[in-house]
C-alpha cells in the first residue's frame, strides 16, 4: 500500500504539535512546586523550621517601610480582586483557590516577588518570607 507523502508530513506535524502540547503542560507548575523551591533555599539557614501560614498572613497585612502592605493592593482577603494602590489598575485574586493561574509560572513568580518585595518591603524577600506568604495564600479558601 502506497502512502501519499503529504499525508505522512501532515501526520508528523500533528504528532509534533501533540508532543509540544504534552511537554508544555508537563512543564506547568503548581504552588506546591514553588514551596519546595523556597524550602530548599530556606534550609540553607540552620534555624529554618518550616513555613507558617500565620506568619505569612501577618507579613501580608503588615505595613512595611514604604507605608504599603501586600494587602494595600491585594486586599486583606486575597481571594477577591484588588487594585493597585497608586494606579487603580485591577488585580486578579492572588489566592490560588480563587485564581488557579496564580503561582504556575516560574518567570511570573520570580518577577512579581522581586518587584513587589522591592516596592513594598524595600528589599528582596527571603526564602522564608516567600514560603510563609505562599503558605498563607494557599490556605485562603
Regions found by a protein language model. Give the residues of each.
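Short alpha-helix boundary/capping elements
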Residues: 64, 78, 138-141
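Short cysteine/histidine-rich zinc-coordinating motifs and their immediately flanking basic loops
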Residues: 82-89
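Post-cleavage N-terminal segment of exported redox proteins
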Residues: 1-53, 97-141
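Local sequence-structure signature of Cys/Sec-based thiol-disulfide redox active-site neighborhoods
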Residues: 57-67
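Short glycine/proline- and charge-enriched loop/turn segments
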Residues: 90-95
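The canonical Cys-X-X-Cys-His
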Residues: 66-78, 133
Amino acid at each position: 500500500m502506497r502512502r501519499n507523502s503529504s499525508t505522512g508530513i501532515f501526520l508528523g506535524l500533528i504528532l509534533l504539535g501533540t508532543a509540544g502540547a504534552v511537554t508544555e503542560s508537563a512543564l506547568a507548575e503548581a504552588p506546591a512546586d514553588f514551596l519546595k523551591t523556597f524550602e530548599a533555599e530556606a534550609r540553607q539557614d540552620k534555624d529554618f523550621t518550616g513555613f507558617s501560614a500565620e506568619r505569612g498572613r501577618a507579613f501580608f497585612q503588615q505595613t512595611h517601610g514604604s507605608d504599603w502592605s501586600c494587602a494595600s493592593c491585594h486586599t486583606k482577603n486575597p481571594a477577591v480582586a484588588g487594585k493597585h494602590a497608586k494606579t487603580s489598575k485591577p488585580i486578579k485574586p492572588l489566592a490560588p483557590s480563587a485564581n488557579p493561574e496564580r503561582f504556575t509560572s516560574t518567570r511570573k513568580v520570580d518577577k512579581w516577588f522581586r518587584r513587589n518585595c522591592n516596592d513594598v518591603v524595600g528589599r528582596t524577600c527571603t526564602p522564608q518570607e516567600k514560603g510563609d506568604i505562599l503558605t498563607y495564600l494557599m490556605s485562603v479558601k
